[in-house]
Amino acid sequence: MALESERNDRHIVFSHANGFPAGSYRRLFEHWRGAGWVVHAIEKIGHAPAYPVTSNWPHLRDELIHFIEREVAGPAWLVGHSLGGYLSVLAAARRPDLACGVLLLDSPVLSGWKARALQFAKATGLGERFSPGFVSKRRRQHWPSAEAAFEHFAVKPVFARFDPAVLRDYIAAGMEPSGPQHALSFRREIETDIYNTLPHHIAGVLRRHPLACPLAFIGGTRSVEVRQVGMRATERLSSGRVRWIEGSHLFPMERPVETATTVLEVLEEALPPS
């Protein structure tokens, strides 16, 4: 999916969070497009049979790399939320010619003993009990209508914090007809597999293949994920290019305009003088 603009010399390749198709970020995309950027995004990462979900996500990384090769004539800013941030940094490390910068939205880099603990948990299967995948594999999938799905999610604590327009966009992008009902289009088993195969090796990859472009980070002030992972590696890799937005791990959905504006500020600061 690409959103066109009158200027085509500035490109954002955006990668979504797990379980949230790219269309869920419509308000961000429109803001960036209005500022003169061309926005490209895979609609649902991990759903193409050629790119299966495996440990440390090498095929998902390649899905992003091949998408950039097809869609963008030259390097782009790789902006990603959660899952998308990790894939962006892995793609930039693998193919530095495709990235002029990486911006992580609440994707703190795991390192040290926490990375080793995750590796052990994955190898033994113990991690599945504590992974978000434990919840996602039991998630309801079908509703009588899209409106019924909206009403269901609107009262859930996580989704109740969303900007109402973003929740509508999530329903529009995340539901599809399934016989007489509507079902989640982001397949539950793929979402669960992504959670259960989180990369434990990113810090090691970046030691062997340091990024050839700037990296920046925007996090949610109340992000549980940031508290769990810590910021030590991210602060080092970003050379202090860190900002915060009030909100949880899903702050792009909670504060879409502020998020879109802050992303552009970070990108503009990193651009060379014209």
Tell me what each language-model feature is:
Residues E6-P49, F67:
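Conserved HGGG/HGGXW glycine-rich cap/lid loop of the alpha/beta-hydrolase fold
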Residues H40-V79, V109, L118-A121, T261:
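Active-site loop/oxyanion-hole signature of alpha/beta-hydrolase fold enzymes
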Residues R140-T221:
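Alpha/beta-hydrolase
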Residues G247-A260:
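Catalytic histidine-centered segment of alpha/beta-hydrolase-like enzymes
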Residues L206-G247:
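Conserved loop-alpha-helix segment in the C-terminal half of the alpha/beta-hydrolase fold
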Residues V13-A17, H81, G219:
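The conserved beta1-alpha1 loop
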Residues C100-H142, R227:
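Flexible "cap/lid" loop of the alpha/beta hydrolase fold
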Residues P75-A117:
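Conserved hydrolase catalytic core segment
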